[in-house]
């Protein structure tokens, strides 16, 4: 499945425990169909305390499935599905289905 969400996009979580949260995509894992969203699905690992990490806690954002997020239309600020179209110069650009406007430049 082609990932229509790219790194740097703003997305909203549409299902699960984190439903309704918005964040920026940090990583896209296309083989696993997952994305890492900043501030969403935060996990904590316990490690031995050290001088660099005195409390021994390591927090990170775990990946969530790509079907659980929806791109936020940069023009309207609302969640939207994504389509593609070709420009006159033959360049493929992403299009917000809700507003019909280009997402990529």
Swiss-Prot record:
Xref: CDD domains: KOW_RPL26 (cd06089)
Q: Which family does it belong to?
A: Belongs to the universal ribosomal protein uL24 family.
Q: Which residues form a coiled coil?
A: none
Claim: Heme is one of the keywords in the record? no
Among Pfam families, the record links this protein to: KOW, ribosomal_L24
- Recorded protein name is Large ribosomal subunit protein uL24
Q: Give the GO biological process terms.
A: translation
> Mind listing the UniProt keywords for this protein, alphabetically?
Ribonucleoprotein, Ribosomal protein, RNA-binding, rRNA-binding
- Describe its assembly: Part of the 50S ribosomal subunit.
């Amino acid at each position: 499945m082609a990932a229509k969400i790219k790194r740097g996009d703003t997305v909203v979580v549409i299902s699960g425990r984190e439903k309704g949260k918005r964040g920026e995509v940090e990583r896209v894992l296309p083989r696993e169909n997952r994305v890492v969203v900043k501030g969403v699905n935060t996990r904590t690992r316990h490690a031995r305390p050290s001088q660099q990490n005195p409390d021994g806690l390591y927090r990170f954002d775990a990946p969530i499935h790509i079907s659980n997020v929806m791109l936020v239309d940069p023009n309207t600020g609302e969640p939207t599905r994504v389509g593609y179209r070709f420009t006159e110069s033959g360049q493929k650009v992403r299009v917000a289905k809700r507003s019909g406007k280009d997402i990529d430049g």
